[in-house]
Amino acid sequence: MPEVERKSKITASRKLMLKSLMLAKAKECWEQEHEEREAEKVRYLSERIPTLQTRGLSLSALQDLCRELHAKVEVVDEERYDIEAKCLHNTREIKDLKLKVLDLRGKFKRPPLRRVRVSADAMLRALLGSKHKVSMDLRANLKSVKKEDTEKERPVEVGDWRKNVEAMSGMEGRKKMFDAAKSPTLQ
């Protein structure tokens, strides 16, 4: 039976309209996020940086204000330098550790994995823990079947082969063979 091509349940114009609506919504969300980020940035800066009032200050007061600002800038620069040094140290350490891992991978060969036969009891013990005593011997429910020895059922006649040829010749011999083939199944 040839495969039937599945037709889309939505027409191409409807797909295009939905796609344009989704893009418009995504653009709107992106613009809103951008505005929120800008507002958060302005709010953060207004909290951290107080407004400077330089009007009406004397020359000595302005110089003191400049010295304070320079001291703050120096402290911030020192902190920034310390953080950059720590980051650089950490990145170097990470790079060295990655190289060590690559070296160790090359030195050791992974052993070939072998299948391990786990019994159902061992699996349950591993899953449930050693406290739970659950036995799941699935072989106990199976019936025992004895193999029949086909060689024992048919006695092998060893005798003169000429007698067998004479006895089996003609229609009488065919009847004997047919009866012999039927007899083991009836017993």
From Swiss-Prot:
GO terms for molecular function: actin binding. The modification Phosphoserine is found at residue 58. Gene3D superfamilies: 1.20.5.350, 6.10.250.180. The keyword Phosphoprotein applies. It comes from the Eukaryota. GO terms for biological process: cardiac muscle contraction; skeletal muscle contraction; transition between fast and slow fiber; ventricular cardiac muscle tissue morphogenesis. Keywords: Acetylation, Actin-binding, Muscle protein, Phosphoprotein. Residues 2-48 are annotated as: Involved in binding TNC. The modification N-acetylproline is found at residue 2. The keyword Nucleus does not apply. Residues 97-118 are annotated as: Involved in binding TNC and actin. GO terms for cellular component: troponin complex. It holds the Pfam family Troponin. Troponin I is the inhibitory subunit of troponin, the thin filament regulatory complex which confers calcium-sensitivity to striated muscle actomyosin ATPase activity. Belongs to the troponin I family. Binds to actin and tropomyosin. This is Troponin I, slow skeletal muscle. The lineage of its organism: Eukaryota, Metazoa, Chordata, Craniata, Vertebrata.
